A protein has these predicted regions:
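Catalytic cores of glycan-processing enzymes that make or break glycosidic bonds
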Residues: 1-300
Length: 300
């Protein structure tokens, strides 16, 4: 008999209430965009404080698995990628686009500029809202949006009014709304707020992460071609090469303890944005991989 162990727990559940030291309540877990969700996923549950969990040999996980072993011969680890890194989204965000991998190696201003991209924090980290963007997103409602939701900054550039400068504030403003035109306007405001090129590191204000799928953002569209090329080099290095050894080390702090905790056969749900280091770990620990024909891991 094969069981399933979910990655997350409810932030208001008994696990968090009893042992809050194991959880980070200043963010919410989710997933980057994929073919099924262009804005990413926001699951809402807290992320794990792995530094604290590793101190006692991941006993919180060991206890869960040992209890499961009373009933099951095998189990599937849901979203095993979360043991390498988790997609953490700010509490004031609704969509997943403003998230960042945790842990991750943030980039300094100097490192960003080493790729040939002149770093401008305000322009790259704050929402890019220009007249032409508003016309594209809202059409004939652009003037209404300017009057109600935006403050004029300079020239054709705007900023969100403080009452609407996060997605959660916008969500609250439209709470209970059912008219589709108004919901479309709300979604447009969500899009404005997530239109950044970089997100600031959640722990270190001097480090930055390229925003996931930034190539579809208006702020990217506004770049010169040379800056787009520099950003693409930086982006590809960051998401596909930079973290492999780092995340391998992170996973090996945790998964061997789980695999050795019981005699159950361990299976991994390893779909999604899978870094190269995942099969290094699963093969080394003899954890079975999930293979689905319609979501092949072969890039070819």
């Amino acid at each position: 008999l094969k069981g399933d162990i979910p990655l997350g727990v409810n932030r208001y559940g008994c696990d968090v209430w009893m042992e809050p030291k194991y959880f980070n309540l200043n963010g919410q877990a989710g997933a980057p965009p994929d073919d099924f969700s262009i804005n990413g996923q926001n699951w809402g549950f807290p992320t794990y404080n792995w530094d604290e969990m590793v101190k006692d040999g991941c006993q919180w996980w060991v206890r869960r698995l040992q209890y499961m072993a009373r009933f099951f011969d095998a189990y599937r680890i849901d979203h095993v990628l979360g043991f390498f890194r988790i997609w953490q989204i700010p509490l004031d965000a609704v969509h997943g686009l403003l998230g960042q991998f945790v842990p991750a190696l943030g980039m300094s201003r100097e490192e960003i500029e080493s790729y040939g991209l002149g770093f401008q924090e305000h322009q790259f980290c704050d929402p890019f809202i220009a007249d032409w963007v508003l016309d594209r997103v809202f059409g004939d409602r652009a003037s209404e949006v300017k009057d109600k939701y935006l403050d004029h900054c300079h020239d054709d550039i705007w900023t969100m009014k403080p009452a609407f400068d996060t997605q959660r504030k916008v969500e609250k403003a439209f709470d209970g709304e059912t008219d589709q035109a108004e919901l479309n306007l709300r979604d447009g405001l969500y899009a404005l707020i997530s239109d950044v090129l970089f997100v600031r590191d959640c722990n270190n204000p001097n480090l930055y992460h390229p925003r996931i799928s930034a190539q579809f953002a208006f702020t990217y569209e506004a770049l010169y071609d040379a800056d787009k090329a520099a950003f693409n080099r930086l982006y590809n290095d960051y998401y596909y090469r930079r973290h492999n050894q780092f995340w391998y080390t992170e996973a090996m702090k945790k998964l061997p303890r789980l695999a050795d905790a019981t005699r159950m056969l361990v299976c991994a749900e390893d779909l999604g944005m899978v870094p190269d280091c995942v099969p290094w770990v699963t093969n080394e620990l003899r954890i079975l991989s999930l293979e689905i024909q319609s979501m092949s891991k072969d890039p070819h």
